[in-house]
Amino acid sequence: MRLILLTLAAVMSAAPALAADPVKLQATLAGSAESDADGTGSATVTIDPAKSEVCYTLKVSGIEPATMAHIHKGAAGVSGPVVVPLDAPTSGTAQGCKPAAAEVIAAIVASPADYYVNVHNATFPKGAIRGQLSR
């Protein structure tokens, strides 16, 4: 019994540290998922709960120049609100880190498929290419 309690205590004390590890997500961006059939791209997103930070690299083609980029809440085929603004990949590539609320970070980590990366341009101001986040 004592061994079980000690093991349980060790696991419980390690859980917060494990939960704070950065989580790497990806998305394949396609115009067919939004509105510009010629646009393509990729997104690599690293969520760091310990820093309340979302770091990203966006690479796009066929939509230049991009005017905005965001992470939105929304399942595939569903439009949703912006939860993390990103820098637009105006020359085809953008990378950086943005702060995000702990609740947003926890929700994205818990269910990445309920969030998508959307890149906009002047022709398609509501979104040119889009891709759902996945592990």
Residue ranges and their predicted role:
Residues 1-4:
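Positively charged n-region of N-terminal signal peptides that target proteins for export
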Residues 18-69, 73-135:
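Metal-centered catalytic cores of metalloenzymes
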Residues 14-16:
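N-terminal signal peptide c-region/cleavage motif recognized by signal peptidases
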